[in-house]
Amino acid sequence: VAEFTFQYAKKTGARVFGGPKFTVSATYEGMFKEELDAAAARHPEVRYQPLLIDATFALLLQTNGEALVIPALNRDGDLLSDFVLQLYGSIAGSESLVLGFDPVTSEVKTVMAEAPHGTAPALQGKNIANPMAMILAGAALLGYIDTSEARQASRAIYEGVFETIHEGKKTPDLGGQMSTIEFTDEVIRRVVSKLEVWSALG
């Protein structure tokens, strides 16, 4: 996990920000901190700002939108992801990935993509749930398939979703009026259009 943190930060041009509460749990969380420090030494080109997890939460409120990769243990990551998504505006605003690594090379070998939010029985049948997380999960999964077609489809989906949001076409949880089906159809329209244009351009 520590090695992937720095590999992903390098790939995305992000800063590694935060870390475990190693002052309380010197063995379990301390081991993770040691692995992060070792990975930082192997990747000196990646900016590294180690912080205790409580300070990470506090300082996130002061960040300026810079890309961050936040290493966290399971419970902390669960809390952190919900917190960040609420800052964005909706817990349905992002995908979640479970990655399996090659034990020797640390390369990603297995990927499972899902929506990080739970079920919402109160929204069932009302056509108002935000489908972003499920759509983005599909885009993320395509991004790990090693073909140009899959990567292009992944890019088209991401762009289609965020362009739709940027133009103010949102579901009610984000302050908009679009239904689940309307939002999904708008994203599909944009994805199809992008893929047709890119195909024509060669």
Predicted regions and their residues:
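Internal helix-turn-beta structural module
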Residues: T147-G202
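A glycine- and small/hydrophobic-rich beta-loop-beta segment
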Residues: I53-A67, S193-W198
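Short, conserved loop-to-beta-strand elements that form functional interface hotspots
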Residues: R47-L59, L174-G175
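Glycine-rich phosphate/nucleotide-binding loop
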Residues: L60-E167
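Predominant activation on well-ordered alpha-helical scaffold segments within soluble catalytic domains
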Residues: E3-F6, K33-D37, M132-G143, Y158, ...
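Glycine-rich phosphate/diphosphate-binding loop of Rossmann-like nucleotide-binding domains
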Residues: V1-L52
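Short glycine/threonine-rich loop-to-helix capping motif typified by GTGT followed
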Residues: A26-L36, L61-L68, L85, K169-K170, ...
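Short glycine-rich or small-residue beta-strand-to-loop segments that form or flank ligand, phosphate
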Residues: R15-F22, A139-G143, D173-L174
